[in-house]
């Protein structure tokens, strides 16, 4: 082969390197007039579609909507606070920090389960909740520069992923079976109106076990205002169908075309038919119309929001109705009256119906608008105009059509009240008027009898129980009682369900004790999966246990961990009284492996903490108490002493007498104890390990495990010594010896005492996981079927599965508890169950864990070569707007299908152990004739050039970077090293695909024989 000629160090790729960063050796300038023009070439922020460009465009426009990348980034930012204020701000009391914690570990089912447990319309609320005035309102991160968490976006993301899984809801089988419930659970229950509040109420009643629950809906579609009045670009009908399907999974029935006041259908008629409890969730069905608009019709150019928004929804929400409705054609100038959320839905919908200009007019000032910022910001971005301090005076018509609107000016007094100045009025030209001045019960009030209404026109109820003050069997919620947001309506239904339950049981002589409500959680077949595992005769209810570390500092802490669901615990290492220790402080510090990252989710910790300061007698007593109170949990005693047969024998016998299930020999503490001839001092020598294991084997019949140090050349040799000495298994690994960092004055942290001295400590956490995975797999390959307890960065179900695949049976956990609290185990449990369940469904086998496969999208060839910035983005928008004019808005993209049954048995945890081992081996066994190259998805690329830079300065100069479009192009020089993919900030933007040509390495110079 012929290599380079001339100097081999000469730079040859001048063209490719043209845009590669170089060090500036002097300041530069560009005239302002030039830079002003240039910046437009790269603009992204102000180039979204707006105004008339939005005609027929009902795609999601919410700025809160997240991709998986965004969700993982945002969830990692969450502090997961104690007594979290976000939960207090949520009407449904969602455990927000828990579901966000699950998202951060890629356990999207766990997140969805948490959400749907408290909010059966969790996806709807994730999409439309005014979080800025609810959960986000109290976010502690609002006190920082980066601002509050995007809670709504995270909720939407997790529940949408669960929707794609297509898994049915079932009733928790741990509850009393339906066949064994008393007759009171067969009571007939009616709900009127199939909107959010009724769906919520019916779902909880179904979970409680009521089997005769019927919803009566006036329309031929379901969902109430979620379907008819919230636009598709905020909430599509697929979401409504999905949540109703989950409700129907519990046996709830729905009857269509049942309109109050028609054909004798009333609240009282239902009671006469034997319905023992009735829930009214009909909203406020009629608009409030200003007398100025009396006798005006849509043909003349006037709409109420109650008329306009349903017309838009029927024409734009695929699957909502079978009719072939057309969008209202508002070709001209539109005035929207009102300043609530509904008014802004009307305003942004008007653009999609062809409006050339939309003006939102309202009586108050900007600071007193009722609409939430989420709605106002979208309208502002889409170029709606705003006209505050005005009140309708009269409509101007010409030839029977609206042509203008006259307004009075209003003023705000010092007392905060608004007044009308009739001396000031003006005219605004328009072609259409949409009134969004609120709604009222109207003519159906009589059909709601015996329900009565208060002076505000809302139902007269007890707001603590949602019970009518005039009929104990009648309950109400949602708009009807003045709670106008979707999430408040959902919570009304939830509250009513419990009180309906209490009422019905009392009717049948079964009083429900006072105390906190106990509504059943969301439950699916995933939750039935068995994740128990047996190792060395010990039956672990789940593979998650506390490592012998800070979370096991005391018996009371282990007790609390068991109460939260942990399967086992290893005690903090204890010694004989003659070897008692006293710790220094400070002794546990955050890692530096994740850069300057503060707060949650630390990638590593370093500690110089010694073994337990408590006596061996304390721990032996504690073990007995824990086994007495938690007989199904595994308790393993961790012991340590020097190389002394009598001491090891005594400690082993004490541990056995305490009632422990097993013993762990701490032969690996990397700091402090080694200086005393213990821990690391014993565990680095195969001969010492062999003899210690022999002594312990002779002293006890309990299974015992040697805890191994990674601070050796080859850990499998230490494992072999333990095996040969009689140990039943090993724990791999203990912490890695390290020095975490130095300050600018050369002092390390932790620095002890006035002299600021330090020592090498043990590094733990995710930073050690690659070392731990290597250790576990190496031991497994060397000692097939030898029991292994893994530890070292097991911070999720996802990480746990990796350890199982490498040969471990259970995992010990410390750092993730230090990062959060004991409740994280529930995230790991649901995550592991989900992983196993998904392997039983053929349609889910292509998922990467809980990450859905990339959707196959037919890419528009017209968009090729057009990045999403500057003039190229404007051109993309033009093409998209043009093609939207002919789009079939009623074509269902993702039709709802029945949940498939498993096609294979759900595998056991044991089936996962060792799965990766056959594919881990020698470098010489790797195929050199099966090469790959990088493929960049232009549509996903954000044009950052990270791939280009790393390939230039750390790779093979194989990527070109267009100076105008910033689109990267992989050339034939690509060697498939994968570095570009590793630094790419967008998941799946770069993939490695088979190389189509034979790979010929560049040897630099001609190969010499």
UniProtKB/Swiss-Prot annotation:
Active-site residues annotated for this sequence: 669
Residues noted as binding FMN in the record, renumbered to the chain: 548, 572-573, 707, 765, 791-793, 814-815
Pfam families assigned: DHO_dh, Fer4_20, Fer4_21, Pyr_redox_2
Tree of life domain: Eukaryota
Listed cofactors: [4Fe-4S] cluster; FAD; FMN
CDD domains: DHPD_FMN
Residues reported in the UniProt entry to bind [4Fe-4S] cluster 1: 78, 81, 86, 139
Pathway: Amino-acid biosynthesis; beta-alanine biosynthesis
Residue sites binding substrate per the record: 607, 666-668, 734-735
Cofactor note: Binds 4 [4Fe-4S] clusters. Contains approximately 16 iron atoms per subunit.
GO cellular component: cytoplasm; cytosol
Binding residue positions for FAD: 128, 193-197, 217-225, 234, 260, 478-486
Annotated NADP(+) binding sites: 339-342, 363-364, 370, 436-438, 479-484
Catalytic activity: 5,6-dihydrouracil + NADP(+) = uracil + NADPH + H(+)
Alphabetized PANTHER family for the sequence: DIHYDROPYRIMIDINE DEHYDROGENASE [NADP(+)]
Family (UniProt): Belongs to the dihydropyrimidine dehydrogenase family.
General function of this protein: Involved in pyrimidine base degradation. Catalyzes the reduction of uracil and thymine.
Full protein name: Dihydropyrimidine dehydrogenase [NADP(+)]
């Amino acid at each position: 082969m012929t290599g380079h000629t001339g100097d081999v160090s000469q730079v040859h790729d001048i063209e490719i390197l043209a845009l590669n960063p170089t060090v500036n050796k002097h300041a530069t300038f560009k005239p302002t007039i030039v830079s002003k023009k240039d910046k437009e070439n790269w603009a992204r922020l102000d180039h979204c579609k707006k105004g008339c460009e939005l005609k027929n465009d009902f795609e999601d426009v919410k700025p809160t909507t997240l991709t998986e990348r965004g969700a993982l980034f945002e969830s990692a930012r969450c502090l997961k606070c104690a007594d979290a204020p976000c939960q207090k701000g949520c009407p449904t009391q969602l455990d927000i920090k828990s579901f966000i914690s699950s998202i951060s570990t890629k356990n999207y089912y766990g997140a969805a389960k948490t959400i749907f447990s408290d909010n059966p319309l969790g996806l709807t609320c994730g999409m439309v909740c005014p979080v800025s005035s609810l959960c986000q309102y109290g976010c502690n991160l609002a006190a920082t520069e980066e601002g509050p968490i995007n809670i709504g976006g995270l909720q939407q993301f997790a529940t949408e992923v669960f929707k794609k899984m297509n898994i049915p809801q079932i009733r928790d089988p741990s509850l009393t079976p339906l066949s064994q419930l008393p007759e009171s659970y067969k009571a007939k229950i009616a709900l009127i109106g199939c909107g959010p509040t009724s769906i919520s109420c019916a779902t909880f009643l179904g979970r409680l076990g009521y089997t005769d629950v019927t919803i009566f809906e006036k329309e031929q579609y379901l969902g109430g205002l979620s379907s008819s009045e919230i636009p598709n670009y905020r909430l599509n009908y697929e979401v409504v169908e999905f949540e109703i399907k989950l409700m129907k999974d519990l046996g709830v029935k729905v009857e269509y075309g049942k309109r109050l006041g028609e054909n004798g259908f009333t609240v009282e008629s239902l009671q006469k038919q034997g319905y023992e409890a009735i829930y009214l969730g009909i909203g406020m069905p009629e608009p409030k119309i200003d007398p100025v608009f009396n006798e005006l019709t849509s043909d003349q150019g006037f709409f109420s929001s109650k008329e306009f928004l349903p017309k838009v929804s029927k024409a734009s929400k695929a699957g909502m109705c079978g009719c072939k409705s057309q969008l209202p054609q508002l070709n001209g100038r539109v005035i929207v009256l009102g300043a609530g959320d509904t008014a802004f839905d009307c305003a942004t919908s008007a653009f999609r119906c062809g409006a050339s200009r939309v003006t939102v007019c309202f009586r108050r000032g900007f600071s007193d608008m009722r609409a939430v910022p989420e709605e106002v910001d979208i309208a502002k971005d889409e170029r709606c105009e705003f006209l505050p301090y005005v009140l309708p005076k009269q409509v101007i018509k010409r030839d029977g059509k609206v042509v203008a609107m006259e307004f009075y000016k209003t003023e705000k007094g010092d007392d905060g009240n608004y007044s009308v100045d009739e001396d000031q009025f003006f005219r605004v030209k328009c072609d259409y008027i949409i009134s969004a001045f609120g709604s009222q019960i109207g003519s159906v009030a009589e059909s709601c009898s015996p329900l009565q209404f208060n002076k505000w026109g809302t139902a007269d109820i007890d707001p603590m129980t949602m019970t009518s003050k005039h009929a104990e069997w009648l309950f109400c919620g949602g708009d009807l009682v003045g709670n106008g947001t979707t999430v408040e309506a959902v919570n009304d239904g939830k509250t009513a369900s419990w009180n309906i339950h209490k009422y019905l049981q009392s009717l049948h002589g079964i009083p429900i004790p006072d105390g906190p409500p106990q509504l059943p959680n969301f439950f699916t077949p995933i939750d039935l999966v068995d994740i128990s595992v047996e190792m060395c005769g010990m039956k672990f209810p789940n593979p998650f246990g506390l490592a012998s570390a800070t979370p096991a500092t005391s018996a009371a802490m282990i007790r609390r961990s068991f109460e939260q669901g942990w399967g086992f615990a290893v005690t903090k290492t204890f010694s004989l009284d003659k070897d008692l220790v006293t710790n220094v402080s400070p002794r546990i510090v955050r890692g530096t492996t994740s850069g300057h990252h503060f707060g949650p989710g630390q990638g590593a910790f370093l500690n110089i903490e010694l073994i337990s300061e408590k006596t061996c007698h304390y721990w032996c007593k504690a073990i007995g108490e824990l086994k007495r109170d938690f007989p199904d949990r595994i308790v393993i005693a961790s012991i340590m002493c020097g190389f002394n047969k009598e001491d090891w024998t005594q400690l082993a016998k004490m541990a056995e007498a305490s009632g422990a299930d097993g013993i762990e020999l701490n032969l690996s503490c990397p700091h402090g104890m080694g200086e005393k001839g213990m821990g690391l001092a014993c565990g680095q020598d195969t001969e010492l390990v062999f003899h210690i294991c022999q002594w312990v084997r002779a002293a006890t019949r309990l299974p015992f495990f040697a805890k191994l140090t990674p601070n050796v050349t080859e850990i499998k040799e230490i494992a072999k010594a333990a095996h040969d000495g009689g140990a039943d298994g090993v724990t791999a690994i203990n912490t890695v010896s390290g020095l975490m960092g130095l300050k600018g004055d050369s002092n390390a942290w932790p620095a002890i005492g006035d002299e600021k001295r330090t020592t090498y400590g043990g590094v733990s956490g995710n930073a050690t996981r690659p070392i731990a995975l290597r250790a576990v797999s190496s031991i497994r390959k060397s000692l097939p079927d030898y029991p292994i307890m893994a530890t070292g960065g097991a911070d999720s179900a996802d990480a746990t599965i990796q350890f199982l695949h490498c040969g471990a049976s259970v995992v010990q956990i410390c750092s993730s508890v230090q990062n959060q609290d004991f409740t994280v185990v529930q995230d790991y449990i649901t995550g592991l169950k989900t992983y196993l369940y998904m392997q039983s469904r053929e349609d889910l086998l292509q998922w990467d864990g809980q990450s859905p496969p990339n959707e196959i999208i037919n890419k528009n060839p017209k968009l090729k070569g057009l990045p999403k910035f500057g003039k190229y983005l404007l051109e993309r928008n033009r093409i998209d707007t043009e093609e939207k004019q002919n789009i079939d808005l009623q074509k269902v993209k993702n039709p709802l299908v029945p949940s498939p049954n498993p096609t294979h048995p759900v595998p056991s945890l044991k089936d996962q152990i060792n799965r990766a081992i056959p594919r881990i081996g020698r470098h010489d066994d790797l195929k050199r004739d099966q090469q790959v190259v990088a493929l960049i998805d232009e549509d996903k690329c954000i044009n950052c050039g990270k791939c280009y830079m790393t390939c230039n300065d750390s790779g093979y100069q194989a990527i070109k970077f267009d100076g105008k479009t910033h689109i990267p192009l992989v050339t034939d020089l690509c060697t498939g090293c994968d570095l570009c993919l590793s630094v790419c900030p967008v998941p799946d933007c770069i993939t490695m695909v088979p190389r189509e040509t034979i790979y010929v390495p560049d040897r630099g110079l001609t190969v010499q024989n």
